[in-house]
Structures are given as C-alpha cells and as structure tokens.
C-alpha cells in the first residue's frame, strides 16, 4: 500500500539555502512585474512599489526581502483580481504609460 501523505516535490525538500530563497524572491518579483505590465498601468505598479518600500522598509523597519514579499503579495492579488473580473487585455498590455498616454514612469529600483 502506498503512503497517502503528500510528498515534498524534488527541490523543495527544505534543503534550500537562504541565498536560494532570496534569489527565488527576486526572480518572482521580476516575473510578476513583467506580467503585471501587460494588465495594469505602469504608474500603478510603480506607486505600489514606492509605497510598499516607504511603509514596510522605511516606516516599519522591515528587511528588503520582507518588503519585496509584501509587494509581491499585493501585485499578485491585483493581477488575480484583474483577470478574475474578465481580462480583455489579450496580453498586449496598455502601452508604455499604462492606460494614460505619456512616457512610462521609472521602473521599481532593481527591477529594470
């Protein structure tokens, strides 16, 4: 009889190093930003990044990685809600300035 309990997938055995976890976080934040610009105004993404950094890092004194994690949670939820409401973007995005015309705002620091 086989064991009915879930098994840990290969590579997720708890043997990761802290460096690998931080690398995963950085890759994931960059990936969600690349996808988010196809669905959300760049201005919104930039403002969420700036406000997350200001609140979690500067005011609350949290680490850089925790700040990125909180930002990731917010942007992931925003993209999810956008798609759930019936995304009609078709992956084309909204242009360099988001929904409004004009040049794009600067990207979040470290996410060029």
Swiss-Prot record:
InterPro entries: Lentiviral_Vpx_assoc_factor (IPR053711), RetroV_VpR/X (IPR000012)
Biological process annotations from GO: symbiont-mediated suppression of host innate immune response; viral life cycle
Main location: virion
This protein's UniProt keywords: AIDS, Host nucleus, Host-virus interaction, Inhibition of host innate immune response by virus, Viral immunoevasion, Virion
Composition skew (Pro residues), residue ranges: 101-112
A GO-annotated cellular component: host cell nucleus
Key word Iron present: no
Gene3D superfamilies: 1.20.5.4730
Sequence motif: Nuclear localization signal, positions: 65-72
Pfam families: VPR
Subcellular location: Virion; Host nucleus
Annotated stretches, region: Disordered: 93-112
Annotated region (Binds to human NUP153), positions in chain: 61-80
Family: Belongs to the lentivirus VPX protein family.
Subunit structure and binding partners: Interacts with the P6 region of unprocessed GAG. Interacts with host VPRBP/DCAF1, leading to change substrate specificity of the CUL4A-DDB1 E3 ligase complex. Interacts with host NUP153.
Purpose: Plays a role in nuclear translocation of the viral pre-integration complex (PIC), thus is required for the virus to infect non-dividing cells. Targets specific host proteins for degradation by the 26S proteasome. Acts by associating with the cellular CUL4A-DDB1 E3 ligase complex through direct interaction with host VPRPB/DCAF-1. This change in the E3 ligase substrate specificity results in the degradation of host SAMHD1. In turn, SAMHD1 depletion allows viral replication in host myeloid cells by preventing SAMHD1-mediated hydrolysis of intracellular dNTPs necessary for reverse transcription.
The protein, known as: Protein Vpx
Organism for this UniProt entry: Human immunodeficiency virus type 2 subtype A (isolate ROD) (HIV-2)
Gene from which this protein is expressed: vpx
């Amino acid at each position: 009889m086989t064991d009915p309990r879930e098994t840990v997938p290969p590579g997720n055995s708890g043997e990761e190093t802290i460096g690998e976890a931080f690398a995963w976080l950085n890759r994931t934040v960059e990936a969600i930003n690349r996808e988010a610009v196809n669905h959300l105004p760049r201005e919104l993404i930039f403002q969420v990044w700036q406000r997350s950094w200001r609140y979690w890092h500067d005011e609350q004194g949290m680490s850089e990685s925790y700040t990125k994690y909180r930002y990731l949670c917010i942007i992931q939820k925003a993209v999810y809600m956008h798609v759930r409401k019936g995304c009609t973007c078709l992956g084309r995005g909204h242009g360099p300035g988001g929904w409004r015309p004009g040049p794009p705002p600067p990207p979040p620091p470290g996410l060029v």
